[in-house]
Amino acid sequence: MRGSVERGWGWGHCASSPLLLWTLLLFAAPFGLLGEKTRQLSLEVIPNWLGPLQNLLHIRAVGTNSTLHYVWSSLGPLAVVMVATNTPHSTLSVNWSRLLSPEPDGGLMVLPKDSIQFSSALVFTRLLEFDSTNVSNTAAKPPGRPYPPYSLADFSWNNITDSLPATLSATFQGHPMNDPTRTFANGSLAFRVQAFSRSSRPAQPPRLLHTADTCQLEVALVGASPRGNHSLFGLEVATLGQGPDCPSMQEQHSIDDEYAPAVFQLDQLLWGSLPAGFAQWRPVAYSQKPGGRESALPCQASPLHPALAYSLPQSPIVRAFFGSQNNFCAFNLTFGASTGPGYWDQHYLSWNAPGCGLPSSGRLVPTSPGHHGSALGAPGLMLLGGGLVLLLHHRKYSEYQSIN
C-alpha cells in the first residue's frame, strides 16, 4: 500500500491534550551517492503472508545511480534500518518465517549485497521519566530522580496502514500493553516518519532544511499522565557501534536561526568519518502545538557509551539485517528543565529530527531584519546594521581613483 494523498497529521482524541514534540532528521548516503535533487519515492507496508499484518514500513528513495532504503518497524521497540546502495535497482527481501522466529538473523536483506555502501540502525528503546521537583541545577545529569522507564518493546502499536494516506508519511502510535495505573488511558506516544522527494523546509518550527536524501522523524508524547508534578521526559536511543568505537556526537553552530528558537545550534550523530550517515536535530522540543518560542524546551543529549546488547530491548529487524554479533552504543535525550515551560503545562511534548545522510553545512539563508531583531535582540540588530553601513562605505571609497 502506498501513500499518495495529502492529509494533515491528527492526534485523534488526544488532539487537544498536552503534548511533547521533538523532530529528528535521518540521512544514509555516502558522499559519492549524494547530490540528487529529486528521488522517486515509495512507502509500502510489507505484507506478512504467514499471519496478521505487522508494522514493517519500507521507504525506498531511488535516484539516478543510487537507492536509499529506510525500513521502520514496531516489532519489538521502534527501530529503523538505514541502507544506501550504488544502484537504482536494489530491492528489499523479507523472510517472514525467519524474521518472526527467535533467531531472526538473515530475515531482512537488501539485494544485491555487494551494492551496499552504507548501513546502520537506530533503536528507540525506552521512554524515560524523571522527577525534577527538587532539582535547581538545569544542567544536572540525570535531570532528576528517575522513575521506572517504559520499555517500547512492551508497547501496543496502531496499524500504520491507517496513516499512510498522508503524503509520503506514516505514523506509529502506541501505548504500554500493561498499564495498571492507567497512565496512558488518554495518552499515546507517536513517531511520525516523513520522506521527501526534493529539498524544502517544513512549515512548523524548527524548520530544518531537508533534502531528497533525508528522512524526518517527529516524536510526540500526548495526553499521558505524568507520575510527578514536575516530570521531565526523555528517550533512550541505541545505535550500532563502529567496531569497538561509538559513532561521534557533534554540535554544529550557525547563525541560521530564522527557523528555530534554539540558540544557533544543531546536534548531530555521525556514522563514519566522511560521514556516511547522520541523525540531526535542533536541541529544542515543544510543549504546545504548534511549536513556538513560548513553548520551547531545551533538549539535552548525553554522551554515547557502549551498551551490552542483552541490556537493551531487542529489535528483530536490526538483528535480522545485521546478525547477532554487533556492538551497540546508547545515549539519552531529555526534554525540558526543572524551571520554565514543561510537559506539565498541557501534557504535550514534541521533538523533531530531520535527516539521515551527510549533514548540510549550516548554510546561511536570507533573513529579514525583523527576524534578526527577535533572535538577537536590539544590540544584535544594531551590530548587523552597523556592519552593513561599514561595508557600503568601504565599497563607496573603493570606487575613487587614486591621485598621484
Curated annotation (Swiss-Prot):
Lumenal side: 36-371
Main localization category: membrane
Signal sequence annotation: 1-35
Transmembrane segments annotated in the record for this chain: 372-392
Membrane topology (UniProt): Single-pass type I membrane protein
Residue numbers covered by motif Lysosomal targeting motif: 400-404
GO biological process: protein localization to lysosome; protein stabilization
Family: Belongs to the GLMP family.
Protein name as it appears in the record: Glycosylated lysosomal membrane protein
